[in-house]
Swiss-Prot record:
Gene designation: pxpA
EC number: 3.5.2.9
A single BP term in Gene Ontology: carbohydrate metabolic process
Quaternary state and interactors: Forms a complex composed of PxpA, PxpB and PxpC.
GO MF term set: 5-oxoprolinase (ATP-hydrolyzing) activity; ATP binding
Name of the protein this chain belongs to: 5-oxoprolinase subunit A
Known function: Catalyzes the cleavage of 5-oxoproline to form L-glutamate coupled to the hydrolysis of ATP to ADP and inorganic phosphate.
Keywords assigned: ATP-binding, Hydrolase, Nucleotide-binding
Catalytic activity: 5-oxo-L-proline + ATP + 2 H2O = L-glutamate + ADP + phosphate + H(+)
Organism per entry: Bacillus cereus (strain ZK / E33L)
SUPFAM superfamilies to which the protein is assigned, alphabetical: Glycoside hydrolase/deacetylase (SSF88713)
Enzyme class, broadest EC rank: hydrolase
Family designation: Belongs to the LamB/PxpA family.
A Pfam entry, by short name: LamB_YcsF
Length: 253
């Protein structure tokens, strides 16, 4: 049977501001990426998200981003590799403490937003993230964009496990990178199209680029976004689609 991990970014609320549909999404995913206070989240939200994830037996990962609350971590920053290392190590440590306090064990690290996209094409940034993971806990898995040579080489250098990721509702360019959110066609808003894309990636190993060309994708995890209007409905449909197609949802080891 084909197996796949379903991951989602959660814990993005901050103070009085509520983001996402965390409680409703949790039953349909196998792993989550928790914001660590830089681009979103706060200490109380981090603790609550960890505790809820453990109740659902969902794997918990850190979701470190740039220190950019206003831009939600989606704006590129002109920072050095050394600064990226510090940012990521700091955020991993913060979440790991909450996980340990709840009696759990952290599973993975997935960079967020602009940090993720920069690392996918910038070997120095990817290296800094991988080094921070290695120095924090080399058994942590590294979630990164499928086919990214920068991610692959960084994981190999530090002998950490890379879990290659694809996206359910994002479009792809010919080189296998994600279409920038600044472009109109970055998101797939039609549920049927998104489900078709996911099945192509999981069962057939490819995705159609925005130019209509087939791009090989060997994904081990699929990211669902939990903050859209129909996010819960979409998560439920993906979950049932996998069941109907004999695709087992499970956490990567």
């Amino acid at each position: 049977m084909t197996t796949i991990d379903l991951n989602c970014d959660l814990g993005e609320s901050f103070g009085a501001y509520k983001m996402g549909n965390d409680d409703e999404i949790l039953p349909f995913v196998s792993s989550i990426n928790v914001a660590c206070g830089f681009h979103a989240g706060d200490p109380s939200v981090m603790r609550q998200t960890v505790e809820k994830a453990m109740q659902h037996n969902v794997a918990i990962g850190a979701h470190p981003g740039f220190p950019d609350l206003i831009g939600f971590g989606r704006r590129n920053m002109n920072v050095s590799a050394s600064e990226v290392y510090d940012y990521v190590l700091y955020q991993i440590g913060a979440l790991d403490t909450f996980v340990k306090a709840a009696g759990g064990k952290m599973h993975h690290v997935k960079p967020h937003g602009a940090l993720y996209n920069m690392a996918a094409t910038n070997p120095e940034i990817a290296d800094a993230i991988a080094k921070a993971i290695y120095h924090s806990n080399p058994s942590l898995l590294f979630y990164g964009l499928a086919n990214s040579e920068a991610f692959i080489q960084a994981a190999e250098k530090y002998n950490i496990t890379l879990v290659q990721e694809a996206f359910a509702d994002r479009t792809y360019k010919q080189d296998g990178t994600l279409t920038s959110r600044t472009e109109e066609n970055a998101l797939i808003k039609n549920e049927e199209e998104a489900i078709k894309q996911v099945l192509q990636m999981v069962k057939e190993g490819y995705v159609n680029s925005v130019n209509g060309e087939k791009v090989a994708v060997q994904a081990q995890t699929i990211c669902l976004h939990g903050d859209g209007e129909k996010a819960v409905q979409f998560a439920r449909r993906i979950y049932r689609t996998f069941e109907n197609n004999e695709i087992s949802i499970c956490t990567p080891k």
